[in-house]
Amino acid sequence: LLPDWETLPYDHFSPHQDLVSERLATLYRISRGECHVALVAAQTALYRLAPQSYLAAHTFFLTQGERLDVDALRSQLALAGYTHVTQVVSPGEFSVRGGLIDLYPMGAALPYRLDLFGDDIESIKTFDADTQRTLYPMRDVRLLPAREFPLDEAGRTRFRSRFREVFEGDPSKSTLYKDISAGIAPGGIEYYLPLFF
């Protein structure tokens, strides 16, 4: 099942992160050939999707025993759309506290806690977002992008170029254009997804 965004075109709010998380997980399974049939509401089928290459380029894995550069991970997570928070409770969030890194990957049922020993990932465990207690040991964690569109410099450049092609007038007077140019994803931006690709 590919969930709908459950918003209307040109709403000034974005879909709930749980829905985006489910959508990205489903799109990932489809792109890997793990899903042969997808149930899609008629309204959902009308909207264009991000290309498979976007999902493939912004999906990465972390494995127990792997050497990890925390600063590089922060940059990679920010580029993939993850939000740095003090306590992880929702998909698309991460937190770094000393040798502990909490991640709530898109498409995951539970958040993950990475325990570092020096620069190595000593353990990966799922944890309860409410109690913050660890639950099950894992060998690796898959991190999908946190949104269905790229907000990196190349994505913003494509958006600005296509925005000027599609919409008349001075783009510098558009709040949407200015927000995207500044790297801010305004509410409802998902309906402008074709302008990013």
Model-assigned labels for residue ranges:
Residues L1-F197:
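ASCE RecA-like P-loop NTPase motor cores
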